[in-house]
Amino acid sequence: RSNSNLAILLGLCLLTVCGGSTNRQFHHELEAEHYLRAGEYDKVLRVGEKSLEASRTLTAYRAVALSRLGKMGDRLFAYPQYYRSDGLFFETDSLHTLRYTNDSIYYLLGARPYTGEDRMVFLRNICYKGTGKYTSLDYYLSALLLEKKLDSFAQAVPDFYLPEDTLPRYYREALVM
């Protein structure tokens, strides 16, 4: 009898090990979320940094971490960007249960959009009206680059930066193009 109990226990242990979650993207999201909640923004950026796979959630976590570090214009494009400007925000899909939501990002930006307001219009408005925090400018300029709106980007930069200011790396590169 004890041998059969031991065999059942061993079988359950093997089942747990073999049948455990092997979704690498999900594990990256959980790890990044953990570091984000702990305020360890550099560690968020190291999660899955060598992988070419990046979920929208992980991409949004990286954007939040870069924004908190003030490095969005210098390092955003060092990571895969598969979702255009949508990757700066979390999915609003109710199937995804996240501790971080777009409300977290709106708090970071210092404003929230009106119901149904286009994100690009929202970001532009809070930058030009001055209702957002300083982080909103990086979100706006990065969104323009992610949407490949180089003309709008080139028009916006002089509105927010003085000629003698040192621009972040990717902003300088975009202006050269």
Task: Describe each model-derived feature in a short phrase.
Residues 2-23:
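Internal/C-terminal transmembrane anchor helices
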Residues 18-157:
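Soluble catalytic regions of membrane-associated enzymes that act on cell-envelope
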Residues 158-163:
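Active/binding-pocket-proximal capping segment
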Residues 167-168:
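Substrate-recognition/cap regions that form aromatic- and gly/pro-loop-enriched pockets
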Residues 172-173, 177:
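Long, compositionally biased charged/polar accessory segments in the mid-to-C-terminal portions
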